[in-house]
Curated annotation (Swiss-Prot):
InterPro entries: ARM-type_fold (IPR016024), MYND-type_zinc_finger (IPR051664), Znf_MYND (IPR002893). It comes from Aspergillus fumigatus (strain CBS 144.89 / FGSC A1163 / CEA10) (Neosartorya fumigata). Involved in determination of the onset of polarized growth and morphogenesis. Plays a role in the regulation of branching in hyphae and spore formation. This is MYND-type zinc finger protein samB. It comes from the Eukaryota. Residues 320-336 have a biased composition (Acidic residues). SUPFAM superfamilies: ARM repeat, HIT/MYND zinc finger-like. Zn(2+) binds at C576, C579, H597, C601. PROSITE patterns: ZF_MYND_1 (PS01360), ZF_MYND_2 (PS50865). The keyword Zinc-finger applies. Its main location: cytoplasm. The gene is samB. Gene3D superfamilies: 6.10.140.2220. It is found in: Cytoplasm.
């Protein structure tokens, strides 16, 4: 039986296709993979350059057809993966570059469930990789402890500094700022992320966050010498030694919370520049945040403490805040704490660094195998550029990026450098590198089906542009996951020593309840161990959640996702005194939301 492809015999074409100068809707209905890939490749260019093509796709069913291709799922076949990626790029181009009516049609075409599934899959892969890395690190550590020969200077019996709980006697002195709100010890969402509130997670030994700038930090007297004779990092093969990332949901008490101090480029010292430390190429420095000043001591005693990278405080994609520093009421009932610089949740972090080992000692025992340290593309490259379009050898979408205005028109991340016309390649995800080193079939199955970093980044960017319309908010707060896109089976195959679980057949998507709120998923990407581009666009999406609905009289919704209560009249709810953007109906909602809100709560200038 003949396929339902259209052909044009008079021009010797086996099927209708889309070119860079001709758009034909029939080409999207092609059932053969190769001509469909060719058409999608040219359509990606057309959706980038032509507003008319974007408008036509909203009325001829083209967007719905592209979303159907995405909902068919990602296959391990290379051609199928290529087809899926091109269709995804086309939808993102339509939503990012289109007008309000075009963006509305993208949301109405049921694109939000696809994005929600991509973000959820990525979070699951991150959690699975971190859990396996921690278990392998523990097994490797116990193997080294069993082979170690005890000496008079051997202190290997002590727990690792990544595992040692913080006690009141071990914490260093710091400045005290009385918080206006006391954070409960148990955060929400703990059914997915269980963490010990007394254990501090750090990203890597070379990225220990500081509670204050280096010139004001108070260190213990033996901070650089307590591990000088520690032999744990001097022997053994550390191929599987993984440094755990900061958890996506860090447990915290009333004393936790990281202070941010943005540093401009013109304030850097020569020793702070990324190119100064040429020997540490495996752990690049952030171009926006320098290292702590190097004190005149020997290289064997160099401190590993660095200042935590600061989040860029940018406005949302739609422009300025709705009402700026409005005169909305505040939740701080203490008249003594009404200063403008005092946040309503005045929290600080303090961290024990007494048992942090020397940098050279730690790096000397780490092999060349991949770890789970996140390397941000904006940190890896000298110029902070990122291009979301996947250019191929046959793609004509080579847009001139010499002009700074073109970068803004492309809808790219504001972290781009205007003087660089070439976009560097994305650094591979540390999680994909981790699974790539595993030779099991299950690991490679996860590698082929897991979302790529650029997929997650484009998803967040598309959400940033469509989530600012309050009339579409119900699509984001009442969504679902696409069954054919989920990777639960692949993740379950990674479990060692467990019997395979018989998963039920995928239920039809139209039968699934719309019980998924996409904003909590997006909020997880504001945590610091994700790349800065992911953090930026996730912060934009969360700030769009705080917009007032002009169609309902300019009222706002409680920013805590489990509440969702709307104001009955304008300025009924109180604003967060720090960012002056989020509103909460009660202090209880603010306490519960602060666990994640602290990552995207930026002080209003």
């Amino acid at each position: 039986m003949r396929e339902v492809n259209f052909s044009i015999p008079n021009v010797n074409k086996a099927s209708v296709n889309i070119t860079t100068t001709l758009y034909d809707r029939r080409a999207l209905d092609c059932t053969s993979t190769l001509p469909l890939i060719n058409s999608l490749n040219h359509l990606a260019y057309l959706t980038t350059s032509s507003a008319r093509i974007r408008d036509i796709l909203t009325v001829d069913g083209g967007i719905e057809r592209l979303v159907c291709i995405l909902k068919e799922g990602r296959s391990r076949d290379l051609m199928e993966m290529w087809k899926w990626s091109l269709a995804f790029q086309c939808v993102v181009n339509i939503g990012v570059r289109g007008s309000e009516s075009v963006r509305t049609r993208v949301v109405e075409a049921d694109m939000v469930p696809v994005i929600a599934t991509i973000l959820d899959n990525y979070i699951k892969v991150v959690d699975k990789a971190r859990a396996r890395a921690d278990s392998e690190s523990q097994r490797q550590s116990s193997r080294h402890h069993s082979k170690a020969v005890p000496t008079s200077n051997d202190v290997s019996g002590r727990p690792s500094f990544l595992e040692q709980p913080l006690t009141a006697e071990q914490r260093t002195s710091r400045r005290h700022a009385p918080p206006s709100i006391e954070i409960p010890p148990q955060p929400f969402f703990q059914e997915n992320h269980v963490a010990d509130s007394n254990v501090l997670d750090v990203t890597s030994p070379s990225r220990v966050p500081m509670t204050s700038p280096p010139e004001r930090s108070a260190f213990g007297q033996d901070v650089h010498h307590r591990r000088t004779n520690d032999g744990r990092f001097a022997h053994g093969n550390h191929r599987h030694r993984m440094q755990p990332l900061a958890t996506a949901l860090p447990s915290m008490d009333a004393t936790d919370g990281f202070g941010l101090r943005p540093v401009r480029d013109n304030e850097r010292l020569p020793s702070m520049l990324p190119g100064f430390h040429t020997g540490l190429t495996s752990q690049p420095d952030s171009p926006t945040t320098p290292n702590a000043p190097v004190q005149p001591r020997s290289s064997a005693q160099a401190t590993i403490a660095r200042q935590r990278p600061s989040l860029r405080q940018q406005q949302s994609a739609s422009g300025e805040s709705d009402d700026g520093n409005g005169d909305g009421s505040t939740m701080d009932e203490d008249p003594a704490s009404t200063e403008a610089a005092e946040p309503i949740v005045g929290l600080q972090n303090r961290m024990d660094i007494d048992d942090v080992g020397d940098r050279d000692t730690i790096l000397g025992g780490v092999s060349d195998s991949h770890d789970l340290t996140v390397t941000d593309p904006s940190e890896e490259q000298e110029a902070e550029t990122f291009n979301i379009t996947h250019r191929s050898t046959v793609d004509g979408s080579m847009i001139n990026t010499d002009n700074a205005q073109n970068n803004a028109a492309l809808g790219l991340s504001p972290t781009q450098a205007a003087d660089n016309a070439n976009s560097p390649a994305l650094v591979p995800s540390p999680y994909s590198l981790y699974f790539r080193d595993r030779t099991t079939t299950a690991a490679h199955g996860v590698l082929t089906t897991m979302p790529r970093d650029e997929d997650v980044l484009m998803s967040l960017q598309l959400l940033a542009y469509v989530s600012k319309y309050c009339n579409l908010r119900s699509y984001f707060q009442h969504s679902h996951f696409v069954p054919k896109l989920k990777i639960d089976r692949e993740l379950q195959m990674l479990e060692e020593g467990t019997s395979p679980i018989e998963f039920p057949e995928d239920e039809d998507e139209y039968l699934l309840p719309d019980d998924v709120n996409i904003f909590p998923l997006v909020e997880k990407f504001t945590v610091r161990h994700h790349s800065k581009d992911m953090q930026y666009w996730a912060c934009v999406v969360m700030r769009n959640l705080c917009r007032k609905d002009e169609s309902r009289g300019g009222i706002r919704q409680c920013a805590y996702y489990k509440c969702g209560k709307w104001e009955e009249f304008q300025r009924q709810f109180a604003k967060c005194r720090r960012c002056r953007r989020t509103k909460y109906c009660s202090k209880d909602c603010q306490k519960a939301a602060w666990v994640y809100h602290r990552h995207w709560c930026h002080t209003t200038p």
